[in-house]
Regions:
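Bacterial Sec-dependent N-terminal signal peptides
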Residues: 1-21
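Short amphipathic alpha-helical segments
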Residues: 20-23, 137
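Mature N-terminal segment immediately following signal peptide/propeptide cleavage
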Residues: 24-36
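Aromatic-lined carbohydrate-binding surfaces of glycoside hydrolases
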Residues: 35, 42-49, 54-65, 69-70, ...
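Conserved short beta-strand edge segments in small beta-sheet-based binding/regulatory domains
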Residues: 86-90
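Compact, glycine/acidic-enriched structural inserts
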Residues: 97-101
Length: 265
């Protein structure tokens, strides 16, 4: 009997429902800790085709139900926007203004998502301010994405750390690889095969930091019900590979954006 009871306790403690609710409570603590205790979150059976959330007032608390964490976060934002008249921006430094007393819902509401896949970001957005973001900046953007129903975010941070390992394993030297990459602000265009070598070499410390940051990013996105869209191999390789593989059919890219001849592979 004791053995069965122990198994039940362990099973409950490790259940997805508990983990999902913890994720939403943590989000509330990040955004408005003074009101975190006024919200409860419940995972509903995921038996319907589209994502959905339900909001209702129960015993002086705002109860939000949904079929996954992404739906719960979207429901939370619906309440913040249309009942509290509160705006949550994606900038970590922007203050979130909350009412002293949370508005009560007279009736329960249920809202369904209009589409299954909700994509966000593109390659160029990773070249504006993102190259210099810390985890706190990404943490806020990921919260914002979840609040706004994004469930398939582009996640390409830190991919150069992987390519560095690949090119090194194939025989290229450290300086050759890091010089092939552009500086941080131009990496999106390097990733799209537009330009190489510009403002290089890329520091090894930056590569290591971005690798660590990407792991944090995708872990949090998955926790909040998202499926990160990761990069694959586009066929773009360093020109220096020709030295190691002289018989390989490597085609030089055309010039782009007025950059000099030397900034292309």
């Amino acid at each position: 009997m004791r053995y069965i009871l122990l198994l039940l306790i362990i099973s409950f403690g490790c259940s997805p429902v508990f983990a999902e609710n913890r994720a939403m409570k943590d989000m509330c603590n990040r955004l408005f800790p003074e009101h975190s205790g006024n919200f409860t979150f419940e995972l509903a059976p995921d038996s319907l085709e589209n994502d959905f959330f339900t909001i209702e007032s129960i015993n002086d608390k705002i109860k939000i139900s949904g079929n996954n964490n992404n739906s719960l976060a979207t429901g939370l934002n619906h309440y913040l926007k249309y009942y509290c008249h509160t705006h949550v921006s994606w900038y970590a430094t922007d203050k979130i203004e909350m009412p002293r007393q949370l508005p009560v819902l007279l009736d329960k509401i249920t809202i369904f998502a209009k589409c299954k896949t909700r994509f966000f970001l593109n390659y160029c957005t990773f070249g504006y301010s993102m190259p210099y973001w810390k985890w706190k900046d990404w943490e806020r953007l990921i919260d914002w994405m979840a609040l706004n129903g994004v469930n398939t975010p582009l996640a390409i941070t830190g991919q150069e750390a992987i390519w560095y390992d690949v090119w090194k394993e194939m025989g290229l030297k450290d300086q050759e690889i890091r010089s092939y990459f552009t500086g941080p602000a131009h990496l999106p265009w390097h990733r799209m095969s537009n330009v190489d070598y510009w403002q290089s070499p890329l520091p090894l410390s930056w590569l290591k930091n971005q690798r660590k940051l990407q792991k944090q990013i995708v872990d949090r996105e998955r926790l909040l019900g998202m499926t990160p869209v990761l990069p694959a191999f586009s066929g773009h390789v360093p020109a220096e590979l020709k030295r190691l593989y002289p018989d390989a059919a490597i085609t030089q890219m055309s010039q782009w954006g007025g950059y000099d001849e030397k900034y292309r592979s």
